[in-house]
């Protein structure tokens, strides 16, 4: 098996979705984050989606009125952020689309090496403040590192099957548990650092392609950003790997504080 890959979207699949490839297709049994379920609409009000035109690139997380966290490997020259979405095709009121004016990857992220997943974190400054309410609001950053066995929630519009890819219209959620760091290191020898945390489940719940940049939420606080994992996704012995937010709190607060 080749190197585990980042979990950014394949945009041509999203274009098929917009073009009606799902018409007449029953999604009840398969439209889930692997091992997950459709989220209760707007239950993840911090969830963001990164778009380049009409192409879904990655997920993201609203952490301030005009700040979104995502994965550094999602960086593009130009994109917009959508907030308040549940269905990507149908609008139901709270959706907002705001251009990104500045992308700030972590300074130690190595964009020239596709095999280096360390420091996979990026802040996006939005042109305008988001209109906040019950369906669009920032999430709190965890003030401590998570512990093995802790139950957490992941969410995104990534593929719901693997290796065959099917991208859902609605936001999907899954419940996962934090892996001990040693078990994570054993699953991916030589690839795991303190800046990463692993999460998965014995039932194969996992994030996958298209979920990159989305949140790992534990006890209502942001603990991780979807980064990379096994290919195919959903292997109980190969958990999803997330950027470990607790290791980057100082950097996040410094950037947001300096930019206002």
Swiss-Prot record:
Give the note. Expressed at high levels in serum, ascites fluid and tumor cytosol of advanced stage ovarian cancer patients and may serve as a marker of ovarian cancer.
Q: Which organism is it from?
A: Homo sapiens (Human)
Q: Which gene holds the coding sequence for this protein? A: KLK8
Q: What is this protein called?
A: Kallikrein-8
* Activity regulation remarks: Inhibited by a range of serine protease inhibitors including antipain, aprotinin, leupeptin, benzamidine and soybean trypsin inhibitor.
**The protein's Enzyme Commission number:** 3.4.21.118
**Location, primary (coarse class):** secreted
Q: Which residues form the propeptide?
A: 29-32
GO CC, one annotated term:
extracellular region
The protein's matches in InterPro entries, at most eight in alphabetical order, are given as: Peptidase_S1_PA, Peptidase_S1_PA_chymotrypsin, Peptidase_S1A, Trypsin_dom, TRYPSIN_HIS, TRYPSIN_SER
């Amino acid at each position: 098996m080749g190197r585990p890959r980042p979990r950014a979207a394949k945009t041509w699949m999203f274009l098929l979705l917009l073009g009606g490839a799902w018409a007449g297709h029953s999604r009840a049994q398969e439209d889930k984050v692997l091992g997950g379920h459709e989220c209760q609409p707007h239950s993840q009000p911090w969830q963001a989606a990164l778009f380049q035109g009409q192409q879904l690139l990655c997920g993201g997380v609203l952490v301030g009125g005009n700040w979104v966290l995502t994965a550094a490997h999602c960086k593009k020259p130009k994109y917009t952020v959508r907030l308040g979405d549940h269905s990507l095709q149908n609008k139901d009121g709270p959706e907002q689309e705001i251009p990104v004016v500045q992308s700030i990857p972590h300074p130690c992220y190595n964009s020239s090496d596709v095999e280096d997943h360390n420091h996979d974190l990026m802040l996006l400054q939005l042109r305008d403040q988001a209109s906040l309410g019950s369906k669009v609001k920032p999430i709190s950053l965890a003030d401590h590192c998570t512990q093995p066995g802790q139950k957490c929630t992941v969410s995104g519009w990534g593929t719901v099957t693997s290796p065959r890819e099917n991208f859902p219209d609605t936001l999907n959620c899954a419940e996962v548990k934090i892996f001990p760091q040693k078990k994570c290191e054993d699953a991916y020898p030589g690839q795991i650092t303190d800046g990463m945390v692993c999460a998965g489940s014995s039932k194969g719940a996992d994030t996958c392609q298209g979920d990159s940049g989305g949140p790992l939420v534990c006890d209502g606080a942001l603990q991780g950003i979807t980064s990379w994992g096994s290919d195919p996704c959903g292997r109980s012995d190969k958990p999803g790997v997330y950027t470990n937010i607790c290791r980057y709190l100082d950097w996040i607060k410094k950037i947001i504080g300096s930019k206002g």
